[in-house]
């Protein structure tokens, strides 16, 4: 619907050229197509108005609705929001600038911003007035109303271009002031840091000798302490090794004693089982031999 309404405000103004002498076409600024967000938003606003000028009589009833005014209001708000956002971005860079200069630039920029907003407001009001006149007609033909609207819009467009260019220039001054203020701030910081570095260098040169002596004394003490700790660690390590060796010997002795004890327990048992097994085999063999009949001889 927004696209349809956008097509609505640009055809009407083009159709207004029937009975009036066409005025030279004002070229669209290049920045409206590839500039700051607010410039792009302003370009969309006027593209919408130009689109309305291209509408034919068949869509006039669509133009009479309030949708066109609402669409223009949204485009106006988008443009002014983008201007405010860009201005706020520049204000962040104006911190190092003098307060009086900053206040003056801000005041001039607000005035230019207000003029541009008033221009867009007048375009919207002119379309609303045209809608009311079309409804009442007031003894005039539709072509006369369209021609008069086209003339007013061309004048408003020229004024808007002039005020937009003025706003661009003031924003550029605002930005240049921010850059200069930032550069002055950086220069002051650089000078201050240079002074501090020089003072630190002189102070370090004056105190370097005592510090070197203290560092050497601390290094000597630290080396002595490290030697002492290393000797203690070696003694402790040797002591631990001896203790581990004693533990190993005790474990081996206990293992041998346990093995001998197990052998003493199981050998008699195994010998007894072997003897019982041999007796059992002899008994089985004897029983088998007794139960086998003697072979008989045939006569």
UniProtKB/Swiss-Prot annotation:
The sequence repeats lie at 75-95, 96-117, 118-139, 140-161, 162-183, 184-206, 207-225, 224-242
- Stretches for region Lipid-binding and lipoprotein association: 205-273
Q: Report residue spans for region: Specificity for association with VLDL.
A: 261-273
Question: Transcription: is it a keyword of this entry?
Answer: no
Q: Which residues carry this modification: Methionine sulfoxide?
A: 137
Query: What single Pfam family name could you report for this chain, choosing any that match?
Result: Apolipoprotein
Keyword annotations for this protein, in alphabetical order, are: Chylomicron, Endosome, Extracellular matrix, Glycoprotein, HDL, Heparin-binding, Lipid transport, Lipid-binding, Oxidation, Phosphoprotein, Repeat, Secreted, Signal, Transport, VLDL
Which PANTHER family does the entry mention? APOLIPOPROTEIN, APOLIPOPROTEIN E
Share what the entry says about its subunit structure, partners included: Homotetramer. May interact with ABCA1; functionally associated with ABCA1 in the biogenesis of HDLs. May interact with APP/A4 amyloid-beta peptide; the interaction is extremely stable in vitro but its physiological significance is unclear. May interact with MAPT. May interact with MAP2. In the cerebrospinal fluid, interacts with secreted SORL1. Interacts with PMEL; this allows the loading of PMEL luminal fragment on ILVs to induce fibril nucleation.
Q: What's the protein name?
A: Apolipoprotein E
């Amino acid at each position: 619907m927004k696209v349809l309404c956008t097509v609505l405000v640009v055809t009407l103004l083009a159709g207004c050229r029937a009975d009036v002498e066409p005025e030279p076409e004002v070229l669209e600024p290049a920045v409206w197509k590839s500039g700051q967000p607010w410039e792009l938003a302003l370009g969309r606003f006027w593209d919408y108005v130009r689109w309305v000028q291209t509408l034919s009589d068949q869509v006039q009833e669509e133009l009479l609705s309030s949708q066109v005014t609402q669409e223009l209001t949204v485009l106006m708000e988008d443009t002014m929001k983008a201007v405010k956002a860009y201005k706020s971005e520049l204000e962040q860079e104006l911190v190092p600038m003098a307060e009086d200069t900053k206040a003056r630039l801000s005041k001039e920029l607000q005035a230019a911003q207000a003029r541009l907003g008033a221009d867009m407001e007048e375009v919207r009001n002119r379309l609303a007035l045209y809608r009311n006149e079309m409804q009442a007609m007031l003894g005039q033909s539709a072509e006369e109303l369209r021609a008069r609207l086209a003339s007013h819009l061309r004048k408003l467009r020229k004024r808007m271009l002039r005020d937009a260019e003025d706003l661009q220039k003031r924003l550029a001054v605002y930005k240049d002031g921010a850059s200069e203020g930032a550069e002055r701030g950086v220069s002051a910081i650089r000078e201050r840091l240079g002074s501090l570095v020089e003072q630190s260098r002189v102070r370090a040169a004056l105190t370097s000798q005592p510090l070197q002596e203290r560092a050497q004394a601390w290094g000597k003490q630290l080396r002595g302490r490290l030697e002492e700790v290393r000797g203690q660690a070696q003694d402790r390590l040797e002591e631990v090794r001896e203790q581990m060796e004693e533990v190993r010997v005790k474990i081996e002795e206990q293992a041998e004693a346990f093995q001998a004890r197990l052998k003493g327990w199981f050998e008699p048992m195994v010998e007894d089982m072997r003897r019982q097994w041999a007796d059992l085999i002899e008994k089985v063999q004897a029983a088998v031999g007794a139960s086998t009949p003697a072979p008989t001889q045939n006569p």
